[in-house]
Amino acid sequence: MNKEKVREYFLSKPGATEEKPFNIPVPVFKVGNKMFGLINIHEPDRPSINLKHPKDKIHELRSVFKDIKPGYHMNKDNWNTVYLDGDLEEDFIKELIDISYDLVFSSLPKKKQKEIMN
């Protein structure tokens, strides 16, 4: 899965927005003004994304899949870096994005969730 396909998938999520809030051109994807993913640029030859995952699953994902590592420049207890050029199938990468989105979306106030879904 390439970066452009990933970007399109991030933006297909309800209420998703793209920002570049840092001093470098890192695309950050948010829902309800909370980040659920970003596209890394630190390794130009190795495309990757950072995703938020549940604390009870984060270490399991890293131990089972060699292309999932602790989140680069992120809180390692909440974020994983997912490499796009390895053995992970496109559908599985989308599932990981869905998990991140759902985790962040569910943390939003109910009023904000309703606004996004309407």
Task: Annotate each language-model stretch with its function.
Residues 1-118:
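Charge-dense, helix-prone N-terminal extensions
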